[in-house]
Amino acid sequence: MIKISNLTKRFDKTVALDRLYLEIGDGITGLVGENGAGKSTLLRCIAGILNPEEGEIFIDGKPRGVLEAKQEIYFLSDYPYSPKAGTIDSIYGFYSCFYDFDLDRFHEILSHFSLPPKGKIVDFSKGMRRQLFIALALSSRTKYLLMDEAFDGLDPIALDEIKGEILKEKENGRSIFVSSHNISTLERLADRFVMLSKGRLAENAETQSLGRNFVKYQAYFETNPTEEQLRSLCNLVSYRKVGSVLNFVMEESAEDLEKIKAAFPPKFIEQVEIDADELVTLAMIKARKDLHQ
């Protein structure tokens, strides 16, 4: 288990992480939050690339700075380093100086892609680089894998292959902590979500419970209530008008819905489905309001 206690990280006067307490256990944990929420900073602190001003990080009970703890963590950054003249073979050799790898597993993952074995990595597209470095990360023999913007640049076919390989690693007992703006992919992979907002923990929930108390309605009123009027009648999360139709999301409450209907009798109202991307976005909006109100 990775245990984080009272973690604070500042950049000049900007507080990137603010007294963060968190435990990361087995399985796949998704890390989400708006830009600037502190996701990359958190991953880099766990990996030992950044040092916090306050707080502690323990890896299976060992302080993060000791060798035994460092050897259990592989960090895949959003733009990993590669020598200018590096090829697939040379980059494997370079990273093998720092980590223990399973070469057969590395080639097994690479077999899903069409990367030129002798091509220079500097000439690879963003997606090709991502395929290579994900293969490298997944073939490392560390217990913990940290992945920053893991799916950025991957085409749908490569993304499906990578998802399958990540699930294999989970089945083999690895703990994976992954950030991504690709919420729909992350929602299908993650066992739980950690959500940051302005450096603070906004949510730490099992995937199936994240935002499940939200309901979305599509309605047509003779006179649309304003956002402020709706907010006075329910725990409003989102409000949007499309022409004469009003879409709004509220925390589930049959009593509040009846209050809305009584105050503004609708000509038409129906509950509509919330997809994974919107669900996480709504949870982020709600968490930000709760933290900073």
Task: Annotate each PLM feature.
Residues 68, 190, 211-214, 261, ...:
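Short, flexible helix/strand-to-coil boundary loops that buttress conserved ligand/catalytic motifs
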Residues 5, 25, 220-222, 249-251, ...:
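A structural detector for beta-sheet-dominated domains
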